[in-house]
Structure formats: C-alpha cells, structure tokens
Amino acid sequence: DLHKEYRRQRQMCIRDSPTAIFTFGTAPGTAVTGKPQTVITTNLERRANMEKVGIDYLVEYPFTEETRHMEPEAFVKDILAGRMHAREIVVGPDCSFGYKGAGSAELLSAMARDLGYHLHVIEKEKDHRRDISSTYIREELEKGNVEKANQLLGQPYAIHGEVVHGNHIGGSLLGFPTANILPPPIKRLPRYGVYVSRVLVDGVYYKGVTNIGKKPTVGGEYPAGVETYIFGLEGDIYGKNIEVQLLAFDRPEQKFTSFEELKERIEKDKEFANAYYENHPEMIAQG
C-alpha cells in the first residue's frame, strides 16, 4: 500500500536511472494461508498511483511456491541484482524478504558491494510517535475516519472500478441517478456509511456523495458496493472506469422506513457535501 513512507522512498531514487517499485502480484499472506488478504490498494489502483507519482516501472512478481521458499540471498542476487539490474535499492528499516522473511536491511547492506548496488534505508515516518503503516490506516478506515486515513496515505483513499448497472432505484424512484461499482472482495472498504467524495471520470473531477454498504433500505441480499451520486455529470457512463475518492465521513449506513424518507436524507447528504466543498474548494481545484 502506497502510504507516506513509500512516497519518501520514491523520492530517494536516483532520477538519472529508471525507477521501479517491486511488489508481489498476490499478497504473500494470501498465498501462505490460502485465505484472501484484504488490501487498501488493489493492483489496478496501485498501477494508477504509480503512474501519477512518476514511477517508470511497477514489478508485480508472482508469489509462487518457488518464490516462497527462495533463500533471501538468492532473492537479492537472482532477482533484485540479476533480473532487475538494481543499482539503487530503497527500503524501510524493518523490510523482510525470502524464505520465512529471513532477509533484512542488514543482509542487503552486506551484499551491496559484491553485487554493485547502493542501499538506502529510510526511517519510518511517524504520526504522533506512531509508525505510519498499513495497519494504522486500516484502523482509521474501520472507524470511518477517512480524513485521518488520507493524511496517513498522503492522498485520498480511493476505490477504482467499472460502472455497472444497479437496481436503478436511484434514478427511477428517487430522482438521483447514481454510479455503481463493485470492488473486488480483496478491497479493504471503510466503515459502511455515506461519505463526501471526489469522482474522476474521463480525466475530470466531480463532487460526489458516496454510499458504501449493502443498501439495507432496498432489501434483498447485496454484496458490499459503492454507489455514488455525481454532481453535474450528464450522460451515460456505464462501462467506464472511474475513481471514487473518499474525503469526509457524513453518517453511518442506515435503514429507512420508506423511499421518501431515504430521498429526504439524501438531500441532506448533498447539502453536507456542498458545505464540505465550500470549506475545501481546493479539493476540486487541485484535481
């Protein structure tokens, strides 16, 4: 997950050479336990982030049984120095790699001279004495505290996805056409509820109100989804890939007694979003 620490690591890269981020295509925890491990940033989202911050290459190395059992020395020699021809390696102080995570920054340092690379170990960035980490960010997302999570990430928490057909209740019954995306099961979603959002469609940012959850008022069994009312957007966007960035928590998801009551609540949600943007005009202006 690309939080502030990794952004600082990127800044250490030498710009007269191509830059690359090395990661695994599948989270190691998923491969080891056989159970899907949720992630703050999916592979699709990571690729978009890398492009935004100017990384030349993103290596999503397959985490196979062979990779899992590779000795750390072989990982450094054969993959980092051998296949990737690394000349500058940037890591955190607690990095681990190789079989049973036995590889460390100390090992990288010990092998640097023989393999011809320079090692940069970047100390962890802290927030009020606590290390900024994926665990910390997940805790804030579970509380619905996206503003804090965004501060830790160094950018808005975002959900990417293709706009799919929903139940059309937003447009037909409520008069609020919405864009529905279904995130993959591995995507770590925040606390269910309504958020002020910023939505990227065809390179243009729009104000939005986003519901994360299972639509309890509608009834039936629905997977957790992301449904967004986009201010000022006209036209059909079904099938398009959009990015929904969450900016502020409005309220928890709740079940209403009627669609009329839901409609009234959505009007208040829109007012809440407009008030947020009046106080934070830069969130649209900066794009």
Where are these regions (language model features)?
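N-terminal alpha-helical segment
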Residues: Y6, R130-S133, I242
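Short glycine/serine/threonine/alanine-rich loop segments
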Residues: R15-S17, I55, Y117, Q155, ...
